[in-house]
Amino acid sequence: MVDTALHPIPGRRTPPHPRSTLPLTTPPAAAELFGDNLDKAIAYHESLATDGSVRGFIGPREIPRLWDRHILNCGVIGEAMEEGISVADVGSGAGLPGIPLAIARPDLKIILIEPLLKRSVYLGEVIEQLGLDNVSVIRGRAEEKAVRKQVGHVDVVTSRAVAPLGRLASWSLPLAKVGGRMIAMKGASVAEEIERDAKAIRNAGGGEVKVFTVGGELLDEPTTLISIRREK
């Protein structure tokens, strides 16, 4: 199912950087997506390309593709989220999708969940360097009781293909409030995963399932999302 009635991104204003003055490596779509926060997006790109690569979070082959395959395609998922809601990012890694989402949507309150110490330390550094007051980090695994207690119940739980769909639902849906959603970035095989893992999704409390794309006006390849509503 393709959902075309997506939520407009609140607060997006005229990009502060004329296209002719953007750094050569910054695509025009970044100015349209991040608006007044473009400088933060550029700083995050620089951090991933340098510090993130040195620390082993980003492979050398991914550096030329950071904007299109990582930052922009994560930032556009905000199109599927209402204004002012709470979001948890499961298995955040180097901050994807949580950091681009936070930059594009400063109205959201975002919790990054990451089990590895070196990555959670990096996330804390990025949050401080970019001045992202709407973001916090919890070190741990989403399925741990202590993490669930810290997070509480949020409106949306997001992730970026960190596990098969059934397992991902078992980690994500318990963090969402009843009526809330998990919204995961997935690829072309998502329909097969839905059929294969239908029982696991139901057991995790999942109900209505939607598959749709976002970013069609900005990206050459729109981002595919699966949304599962928590019903119990």
From Swiss-Prot:
Protein role: Specifically methylates the N7 position of guanine in position 518 of 16S rRNA.
Family: Belongs to the methyltransferase superfamily. RNA methyltransferase RsmG family.
Residues at which S-adenosyl-L-methionine binds: G91, L96, A142, E143, R160
Keyword Lyase: no
This protein's UniProt keywords: Cytoplasm, Methyltransferase, rRNA processing, S-adenosyl-L-methionine, Transferase
Molecular function GO terms recorded: rRNA (guanine-N7-)-methyltransferase activity
HAMAP family xref list: 16SrRNA_methyltr_G
Name this protein carries in UniProt: Ribosomal RNA small subunit methyltransferase G
Compartment(s): Cytoplasm
Residue numbers spanned by region Disordered: 1-24
Keyword field contains Methyltransferase: yes
Primary localization: cytoplasm
GO-annotated cellular components: cytosol
UniProt-listed Pfam families: GidB (PF02527)
Organism field: Corynebacterium efficiens (strain DSM 44549 / YS-314 / AJ 12310 / JCM 11189 / NBRC 100395)
EC number(s) reported in the record: 2.1.1.-
InterPro entries tied to this protein: rRNA_ssu_MeTfrase_G, SAM-dependent_MTases_sf
Annotated S-S bridges: none
